[in-house]
Amino acid sequence: MALAGPLKVCIVGSGNWGSAVAKIIGHNVKNMKKFASTVNMWVFEENINGRKLTEIINTEHENVKYLPGHKLPENVVALPNLTDAVRDADLLIFVIPHQFIHKVCQEISGKVHKNALGITLIKGIDEGPEGLRLISDIIREKMNIDVSVLMGANIANEVAAEKFCETTIGSKNKNHGLLFKELLQTPNFRITVVEDADTVELCGALKNIVAVAAGFCDGLSCGDNTKAAVIRLGLMEMIAFANVFCKDSVSIATFLESCGVADLITTCYGGRNRKVAEAFVKTGKSIEELEKEMLNGQKLQGPQTSAEVYRILQQKNMVNNFPLFTAVFQICYEGKPVEDVISCLQSHPEHM
């Protein structure tokens, strides 16, 4: 497969993380002949104080709703029409909430040329009749293109502020992974490419469940020792889940990359899932209410992923093997007391 340069890039999504990535790509392509100098970014159109969000981004070069305070390069062009945004794109960067991936892929299927490559930055999983489905699998099936994944300890505002961090690209085709590394790497955004792509992607989804448990601990003022236990036992459940559900062999080394333990730590200390879970305990409000209040209406991935994982575990009759994942689901959706997160640790199979 040979893509003729300069390669056109389209970012499918423009939330907090999508806008931070747009800032990186916009700056990078200016200095590289391999990539086209204009970057399309699909924006779900919204009205902000009577003005269209796309108009604000294209004139003021700032996503004032989802990444305020950070200027986007002028070569990043916001487009409200998804088909227009992806037209003629060689490289597609998927960065939308995971529940919208089916609709987006259906809309652009057949409208992207057959040699295009995708990379998903979406942290979530889906479920089908056979159980677990990865987001990359859905894109691959619906669009018939090769798809890599990027996951890591990457809190969007810190990335946009150009604070140093690492990330992991998982790609079953190493050359495709290296191409995306070339597009995305900066002195402060360092990338490792591995071929264990399914594990990389699962890490990105499952760590959000663990972060919700960490937030519950913070809400209960459990202390750092308990939170460390949540992180360790959460990591053990992530590894066990990957071993059961990944089609290809799982490398434990992948969990030591940025997508694994590093992302888990940063999310359990600094991410939105932790923050909202703590507020859930302290305020008694529902997850939905807190999303509106604290996230500008953006969706929290951790509780949703816990529900999908729970249903998959039920299908396999394995709920009891994953007490931390199960407790998060039951606290979020079944009204179980938050203290159950502690009792699930006390009787965790890791200690038996």
Curated annotation (Swiss-Prot):
Keywords: Cytoplasm, NAD, Oxidoreductase. GO terms for biological process: carbohydrate metabolic process; glycerol-3-phosphate catabolic process. The keyword NAD applies. GO terms for molecular function: glycerol-3-phosphate dehydrogenase (NAD+) activity; NAD binding; protein homodimerization activity. It comes from Xenopus laevis. GO terms for cellular component: cytosol. Plays a role in regulating cardiac sodium current. This is Glycerol-3-phosphate dehydrogenase 1-like protein. The gene is gpd1l. The active site is at K207 (proton acceptor). It is found in: Cytoplasm. It is an enzyme of class 1 (oxidoreductase). InterPro entries: 6-PGluconate_DH-like_C_sf, 6PGD_dom2, G3P_DH_NAD-dep, G3P_DH_NAD-dep_C, G3P_DH_NAD-dep_euk, G3P_DH_NAD-dep_N, NAD(P)-bd_dom_sf. NAD(+) binds at G13, S14, G15, N16, W17, G18, A156, R272, K299, Q301. Belongs to the NAD-dependent glycerol-3-phosphate dehydrogenase family. Its EC number is 1.1.1.8. Substrate binds at K123, R272, N273. It catalyses: sn-glycerol 3-phosphate + NAD(+) = dihydroxyacetone phosphate + NADH + H(+).
